[in-house]
Amino acid sequence: MDLFSSKRLRHSQTDGRRANHEMKFDSRSPIESDLGRVIFSSACRRLHDKTQVFPLTSDDNIHSRLTHSMEVMSIGRSFALNLFEMDEFKVKIGVDSNNLKQCVRGLRDLESLLSTICLAHDIGNPPFGHFGETALQCYFSNLFEELEDDLKHSSGSKDFYNETILSMLKTTKPAKHDELIQDLADFLADGSLAKFDYIYFDGNAQGFRVLTKLQFLNDLYGLNLTSASLASFVKYPNFGAKDKRSISTKKHGVFSTEKEELKAVMDNCGIPALGDTAYYRHPFSYIVEAADTICYLIMDYEDAISKGWVRYEDFKEILKNDPNGKKVLNESEKHFNENAPSKKKMVQLRTELMNHFVNVSIDNFMKHYDEIIAGNYKKELVFDGGEQESLATKIQDICRKDIYSNPEIESLELTGNAVLTGIIDYYMKYLFHPEKSFRMHAKHLMSKAIFQAVMQEHYNAVGEKKDAWDFYDDFDPADFSFEERIRLIRDFVSGMTDKFAVTHYRKLNGQQI
């Protein structure tokens, strides 16, 4: 395996200039340069106004996706530094401990790679947190059921088709009608990989699409990150059906539109395939997952304390009832007096808990490394307590009970669902409208970069050698297929921030000018 593959999907002239020492004050490796590409991307900036747990909060102390991702990045860096102190780890990744140059290069690349992917791990998440994913899944599942029912009962009669199908027929030449209906039927068929991209919508899959395509400048290579970074990013390297028997296929982790990109980066890293539609995980994806879990377990609880929903004393009681938790608690209490403020106590406890979970994760990573490489390890590092229930599992159960099901969160999640459903309804109506003027109005309200990215995919799919930006002004959305139009809607909506989505929804409904 080449776990640090610096190959990109498109050749980078900048990498070549660095290698030839043409860039005097830039000695970064290709993997190191990936971090800058993510930090300076618009998709990363938008994380500042996306929900972590608490939707539409005005409390500046509460985590957004961006602050959460920055903390995950910090933990990822800690993993890199701790792992590289272990000679056993260096042997496993092919670094000679006696070769200073190899050690420096290896540490710099590992630290940068984990920092990059930890920062980017939520870059594809829609507005309103994980409930936003559920809202998109439900919308498209219901839509497809309606369309399937129409096709099933129409018997070819246009009188029974719904508005979406009729609009497509009205904007298509009669000679192409049968082909259009057949294409729609194929898309809706059971086992359709393209259909999975919607009914199993996942922020991880959208994130891979953002990194590989949707940061659109003048081609469909997105940020053009190294294969090592992209392979490590993919939490569920699977573009087929979900299958919980394997950790790789637990979710539909890559859209069918990016299956060739997945194959390329995995092949570049030497990651074996798992059947026809999946791959083993890149080993470093386990580390990224652990860093994410450590942060959300602890910081979500800390946010709940800030909001007054739970108390430090409640958290203390959880830890007292676990042998490892008790050790962590005792260690943290050495650093403050009993009458210290709760905030001081929680910060110290956070530090000790993070240290504990990092150590647990590293121990499990090294203990099971051969299983991980062979694709046989099926647990999360943080939750693997061996024969005993892990401390992380107990904290997660409490978070689900006392935080994630809080009426305030659930109420705002339903608000988010109404907003997302309303926006998609609007674009479904007007991107499929029989009148061109309505379609063009809808087009001009959408992100130009995302529209051009889908245009470029369309041209590539039909074999037309055109550049999207040259034809954008006159392009009619009716020239898109059904799937391309809903792909455009999905990409646009999932990229919105919480506040932009609310404002956009109000404007579309005439509630705001």
Placement of each model-derived feature along the sequence:
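C-terminal amphipathic alpha-helical interaction region
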Residues: 444-507, 511
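Polyanionic (Asp/Glu-rich) segments that form extended negatively charged tracts
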Residues: 327-347, 351-380, 438-439, 443, ...
